[in-house]
Regions:
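Glycine/aspartate-rich loop-and-adjacent alpha/beta segment that forms the canonical ThDP
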Residues: 30-103
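Conserved thiamine diphosphate
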Residues: 1-40
Length: 103
């Protein structure tokens, strides 16, 4: 069957803090997402892109950070944060942290 988008499913509930991170691609976004998730008074879900040896990365796992960056840059995996508290303030709760401008 088709792959399900766990982040999208969790965001549909409306009361779950959701983040997609890739520490090797954007450490600052990772830290920000973890702090926000920890401070959220409700369920939080952090989905991390973490390549493994089975992915067949050229040069092995020594290149995992570059692989994470490539996955983000090409749009295979998006960095995002969904914070329901922002909606309470009249703001968009979904923040896309991936930079697709260079693609």
């Amino acid at each position: 069957g088709a792959k399900k988008d766990l982040a999208q499913i969790a965001m549909a509930y409306g009361h779950v803090y959701v983040a997609q991170i890739a520490m090797g691609a954007n450490p600052a976004q990772t830290i920000k997402a973890m702090k926000e998730a920890e401070s959220y008074d409700g369920p939080s879900l952090i989905i991390a892109y973490a390549p493994c040896q089975a992915h067949g990365i050229k040069g092995g796992l020594a290149n995992h950070q570059a692989e994470q960056k490539r996955a983000i840059d090409c749009g295979y995996f998006n960095l995002l944060r969904y914070d329901p508290r922002l909606e309470e303030q009249g703001k968009n709760p979904l923040q896309l942290d991936s930079n697709m401008q260079n693609n």
